[in-house]
Amino acid sequence: RRGAEPVIAPMLRVEFADEIEVGLSRISALLFTSPNGVRAWLSGRSETDLPAFCVGDATAAAALEAGFSKVRSAGGDANDLIALCEARLVPGRHRLLHLRGAHIAHDIAGALQARGFEVDEAVIYEAVAKDQLPKKAAQLIRQRELAVALFHSQRAAVAFTALVEDADLSDHLNTVIAVAISQAAANGLVRSDWAAVKVAETPNENDMLGRIGFDL
């Protein structure tokens, strides 16, 4: 829309669990903290009748697309999801199931358990760092044609930093603006010398794009 050419360059490869063996008879709601969690669930299970409590709008959109009809979005981060559960569910009455990846930035289950909820967890996918930078991304960085880089998680930021170092391209980032979805994601970029590192005020794509508009 602003004349920029977007390039998608995944830093992580998502691997779904071969089997998802969890019982749902006592579960009142499913908790999703990424679209990958929704996709992983649907890769091994077909149940979409339970309420889906989602960390943000992108995850909620993925749940709706997957066939969930009772979807609530916290519109933010892990703390917002915890607050949403507290507002809509009752400890001791509602048992929850957090469907998550192998690596977590926040212990949502532990936080909800501390508030009196019964919470089960199931690891249903893993995001694995790639072995090298995607060719298009490496080319843009090497030719100093990259203007802005968006980072949607801390693990993606850490993986990018390592891969850039492996490719001996770290000194090519000093003209690039990095935009991170959260401070945690920004913390994964500290080893690189960027033109600037911007952090979204709220953890969503629209705010990240707004930060780009501020600079361009």
PLM feature segments, named:
Residues 1-216:
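Signature of uroporphyrinogen-III synthase
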